[in-house]
Amino acid sequence: MAVQRFRQPRVAELVASKLRDDILSGRLKEGDVLPSQESLFGEFGVSPPALREAIHILETDGLISVRRGNVGGAVVHHPTAERTAHMISMVLQARAATPVDVSEALMHLEPICAGMCAAREDRMTEVVPYLENEIGIQTAQFDDISQYVPNARRFHETLVSRCGNEPMILLIGSLELIWSTHESAVWNGDEGSAPMVDKTRRAALRDHQRLLDAIRDGNAARAVRLAEGHLAAARRNTLAVGTAHTIEAKLIADLGARPDSRPLRNDRPQSSKGIAT
């Protein structure tokens, strides 16, 4: 009988695993700098090559970035929806997936999130204020065509982020971010033949308000139906303008640097009354 041999982890993998646990558990915060190499040598009792390999493993994981020069060091990064979306978008691009594929997935998945939002017992504090805030921003900036699509997309991203289920927030939220970058590129970039017309924008904003009303009332079935109808219309409008390309991962990579970027999980919003941003 053949003896099954188990591969022993290398020293570098053990060091990387310990540091990874420190990052994911929150013992090391976003933006923290890892201790100096001399300190890590002393803590783990490993050779310089093993420590460098451990740092490289964490860098490949996206959990640290190494700064060079006088202010150098290994800076900690916690996993985010944006980084997850970037990884998913790279896989989708490698498989030649298109915006049509992503939007079809969202047509099936986002209405589920809408229903979950409406079914939350704490929706009046954990869902409604966030969606009201987004609609307030949309309304205040309605005439600024360059801001309409990013603002509208954040309503959808917020809807998913408040559904109350962390795996769905991460996975569906990543698809939302991928679709958001495509839709913004279509309407605000070179691909669009014309800006979104006033009638279309008003209809979309009205749909958002109706969806919010259904969620506020706790009517999950109506929230699902409204989300399905709204997503179908939005998908038709966008895909009629731009469908030619596969998913572009570089658009997601640039997400954190865009001026209108906001985290997927919002802090508690202020009142949307009088918003002028």
Feature roles, as predicted:
Residues M1-H108, I112-G115, A119, T246-E248, ...:
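Short linear motifs at protein or domain termini
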Residues I178-T277:
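C-terminal all-alpha effector/ligand-binding and dimerization domain
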Residues E59, A97, R154-F155, R206:
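Short, conserved clusters of charged catalytic residues that mark active-site
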Residues R27, D32-S39, A94-T98, E121-V128, ...:
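Hydrophobic/basic alpha-helical segments enriched in Actinobacteria
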Residues R10, S146, R201-A203:
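Short helix-capping and inter-helix turn/linker motifs at the boundaries of alpha-helical repeat units
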Residues V102, L106-G189, D207-R210, R222-R236:
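Conserved amphipathic alpha-helical segments that form helical-bundle/coiled-coil interaction surfaces
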Residues D21, S25, S39, A140, ...:
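Surface-exposed charged/polar residues within alpha-helices that form helix-capping/stabilizing sites
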